[in-house]
């Protein structure tokens, strides 16, 4: 099972950002350093020259949307002030999927953003020539480099071939979802803002009056009508993990709820366990939106970014998810 709990909440309180977000530590000085942002994951001992680390948090659980935007703000500042070809973000294993997808959507940059559990695995990527223009990448323990647009460890794009080198499998190119002519880039240019909105952006007043949307993930088999009713006043969106081929939804229609509902496939029905599935817009209840090939966590991340930018109508959301893009 991919999820440790049935409900994975993005919690709602936006903590005051007036407190210092990070502490900076000089690992080395001089030119040619690789910027590293630490948000969790195991501490790496041993000296590594040419690395400048900034510690934001030391989280052991899945990063929430507030933390993701805090990271984005820091990444944006760092990328603008450094001459490096990119940046490494170290995080815990639970957060790899949401962080790599979040960065793929939010950053429209030719610099490379490497998400990893251990910065040592990421350094060769940024040292390699030809690292730019590849978007967000995930560096795995196995020395393989994966695309950040797909669930981690599913779509390899290169392999480490030395201390400073990567053998890339493809020329640098843009994934369709976020290509420069994609719907997300052309019509939702506000998604590529790393700024934490300073005022409440949720359309409805919630008890916490926060700008961080709550978008839980539930399993199609695992919920009851009363659970949804008890949640409905406190959530801004919902991701339902489709039970797969045997479609036996307990809900025939979602047209009566006032938050967006996205159905996603967890890809576990695939023989090869690739972790990528597809759910078409014809096999979901009325009023719901299909996530296409996005995983449940990716759907949650994209929906949270959309809601953060006040994009909540079905017609708009349908264009964003990769199901009707032809
Ligand atoms: C996000 O997680 C941090 C650390 O666990 C927590 O302090 C904060 O309150 C959370 N924020 C939200 C919006 O849930
Ligand atoms: C980090 O290095 C820079 C340049 O070498 C230096 O100016 C700065 O004082 C150092 N900062 C710390 C905290 O050591
Ligand atoms: C890394 O640091 C070493 C010395 O610690 C230096 O010789 C080398 O040129 C540096 N490499 C880069 C790419 O800056
Ligand atoms: C994060 O905290 C854990 C303990 O909770 C500790 O073992 C680890 O070294 C810390 N990581 C960093 C980078 O400080
Ligand atoms: C984007 O451009 C490519 C060619 O560069 C084209 O094949 C594709 O159809 C375009 N997509 C959209 C949505 O316009
Ligand atoms: C993305 O970056 C390209 C090149 O820098 C730029 O032309 C385009 O307008 C940017 N798109 C968005 C949505 O910011
Ligand atoms: C990065 O920060 C600059 C200002 O410091 C801002 O103009 C720019 O829009 C930010 N970029 C993103 C992606 O938020
Ligand atoms: C929220 O921010 C926007 C600009 O980002 C501004 O136009 C709007 O007036 C603000 N709303 C409130 C209630 O402050
Ligand atoms: C939303 O909250 C504001 C102040 O927090 C209040 O003035 C307004 O009446 C509320 N709107 C609704 C629809 O509850
Ligand atoms: C739906 O559920 C009913 C009874 O629970 C069962 O008889 C039927 O075969 C199911 N349909 C599918 C497609 O699984
Ligand atoms: C972001 O862009 C979309 C599409 O243009 C628009 O509908 C939405 O209102 C924008 N969000 C904000 C907060 O301006
Ligand atoms: C499903 O998406 C296709 C485009 O791929 C569109 O033509 C069709 O109307 C959509 N169907 C529904 C039920 O939304």
Swiss-Prot record:
GO biological process, one term: ascospore wall assembly
Family the UniProt entry places it in: To yeast YGP1.
Other observations noted: The program of events of meiosis and spore formation reflects the sequential expression of at least four temporally distinct classes of sporulation-specific genes, SPS100 and SPS101 genes define a distinct class of very late sporulation genes.
Signal peptide extent: 1-18
Protein name, per record: Sporulation-specific wall maturation protein
UniProt induction comment: Induced at very late stage of sporulation.
InterPro entries linked: Asp/glu_Ase-like_sf (IPR036152), Asparaginase/glutaminase-like (IPR006034)
Source organism, top-level taxon: Eukaryota
Segments forming domain Asparaginase/glutaminase: 19-324
Keyword annotations of the record: Glycoprotein, Signal, Sporulation
Glycosylation sites: 26, 50, 58, 64, 76, 108, 181, 190, 199, 205, 248, 281
Its job: Serves a protective function during the early stages of spore wall formation, and contributes to spore wall maturation.
Coiled coil (UniProt feature): none
